[in-house]
UniProtKB/Swiss-Prot annotation:
Record-listed E.C. numbers: 5.3.1.24
A biological-process GO annotation: L-tryptophan biosynthetic process
Protein name per UniProt: N-(5'-phosphoribosyl)anthranilate isomerase
Pathway named in the protein's UniProt entry: Amino-acid biosynthesis; L-tryptophan biosynthesis; L-tryptophan from chorismate: step 3/5
Reactions accelerated catalytically: N-(5-phospho-beta-D-ribosyl)anthranilate = 1-(2-carboxyphenylamino)-1-deoxy-D-ribulose 5-phosphate
GO molecular function: phosphoribosylanthranilate isomerase activity
Entry-linked Pfam families: PRAI
Gene3D superfamilies: Aldolase class I (3.20.20.70)
Keywords assigned by UniProt, alphabetized: Amino-acid biosynthesis, Aromatic amino acid biosynthesis, Isomerase, Tryptophan biosynthesis
EC main group: isomerase
Family: Belongs to the TrpF family.
Length: 203
């Protein structure tokens, strides 16, 4: 199971978290996010990674911005309102499409990307907020999603204290944690991060 730790802002923490065994390290390129990092900082973070892949999270980006980031990052995670036509401009094996889930009607959006074999990340919907809300998706809905598609990364309120119980109910392709493992936005509690990774990897 893939473990993604998102919202990293400090190169030193990126190195530590990579050594803990995180598969993916996520950086936020959305300027309105409290976890925003610029291109130069992203390059510094990339240099610190051991075996982890770097995921650049974008929100409603331009074509040019994505192409620039693909020269640095291993994956692009589209976390805004990007449609399938835009996402299909890029190699599907380097793309993750985040879908903010409120209720069962959102399953149709997931199917759209499933039909193209594009990895999907599901996050809890919160009006006007793109990720990092700390809110959870209903477990029954989460199970329907992961039963429907085998390339789903789950996120939203995941922590070292609840991940074991959640994974007793759902079997996703991957898990993504951010805000619940922080001291402050962009600064991780490394003890919590290590516990989270260990719990997932030692299942």
């Amino acid at each position: 199971m893939i473990v993604k730790i998102c919202g990293i802002t400090l190169p030193s923490q990126a190195r530590e978290i990579s050594e803990y065994g995180a598969d993916y390290i996520g950086v936020i390129t959305y300027p309105k996010s409290p976890r925003y990092v610029d291109v130069e900082r992203i390059k510094e973070i990339k240099e610190k990674l051991k075996n982890s892949k770097l995921v650049a999270v974008v929100v409603n980006p331009s074509l040019e911005q994505v192409l620039e980031l693909l020269n640095i990052a291993d994956f692009i995670q589209f976390h805004g309102d990007e449609g399938l036509d835009f996402v299909k401009n890029f190699p599907k094996d380097r793309v993750i499409k985040a879908i903010r889930v409120k209720n069962e009607s959102d399953l149709e959006k997931i199917k759209t990307f499933k039909n193209e074999d594009i990895t999907v990340l599901v996050d809890a919907f919160k009006e006007g907020v793109y990720g990092g809300t700390g809110e959870m998706i209903d477990l029954n809905l989460l199970k329907k999603i992961t039963d429907m598609y085998d390339k789903v990364i789950i996120s939203g309120g995941l922590s070292e204290s609840n991940i074991k119980e959640i994974l007793n109910h759902v079997k996703p392709y991957g898990v993504d944690a951010s805000s619940k493992l922080e001291v402050s936005p962009g600064v991780k509690d490394l003890d919590k991060v290590k516990k989270f990774i260990d719990i997932v990897k030692n299942r």
